[in-house]
């Protein structure tokens, strides 16, 4: 366990980084729907809509499940994932080009890669959307501290070789994480 300084969070105020998330927080059946008590209009038995396809426009309805716990305003302001020095990136930049939350984040967590910090920010690239950069077996994210990191991957048709995001704050770790989404 480590003491992490306070940084802007994408979480809604009622949710903290120590909150326990239960399956039923995201999954439930629709008693009153045409699918009855064993189904939901949102696959796979989700409470709300959660789009995972590339080129999905950002709006509250498309990511209603994410916005149950995460602040849409904070995400669109790039409070926790800032743009790089060229003005690219950040959550808002990725959402603006139709990258779904699931392109980078896995709500079920990340398989342990055997490296310290391998679960940082639930980053686990969806290899249907994000591909490894030349020479890498998997898309790579390197966390180099608060508000800072880099990606080596192919996303939205562009190769990112060690694409850096702004430096700032205390460096907590500097280990590359190779991600291979086994299943969702």
What kind of feature is each model-predicted range?
Residues 1-184:
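A motif-centric signal for short, conserved binding hotspots located
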């Amino acid at each position: 366990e480590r003491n992490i300084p306070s940084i802007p969070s994408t979480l809604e105020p009622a949710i903290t980084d120590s909150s326990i998330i239960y399956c039923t927080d995201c999954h439930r059946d629709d008693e009153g729907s045409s699918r009855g008590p064993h189904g939901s209009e949102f696959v796979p038995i989700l409470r709300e809509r959660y789009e995972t396809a590339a080129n999905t426009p950002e709006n509250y309805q498309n990511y209603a499940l994410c916005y149950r716990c995460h602040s849409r305003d904070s995400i669109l302001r790039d409070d926790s994932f800032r743009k790089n020095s060229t003005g690219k990136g950040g959550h808002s930049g990725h959402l603006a080009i139709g990258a779904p939350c699931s392109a980078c984040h896995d709500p079920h967590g990340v398989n342990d890669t055997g490296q310290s910090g391998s679960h940082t920010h639930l980053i686990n690239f969806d290899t249907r959307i994000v591909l490894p950069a030349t020479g890498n077996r998997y898309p790579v994210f390197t966390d180099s501290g608060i508000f800072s990191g880099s990606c080596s991957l192919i996303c939205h048709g562009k190769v990112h070789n060690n694409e850096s995001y702004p430096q700032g704050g205390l460096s907590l770790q500097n280990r590359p994480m190779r991600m291979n989404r086994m299943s969702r």
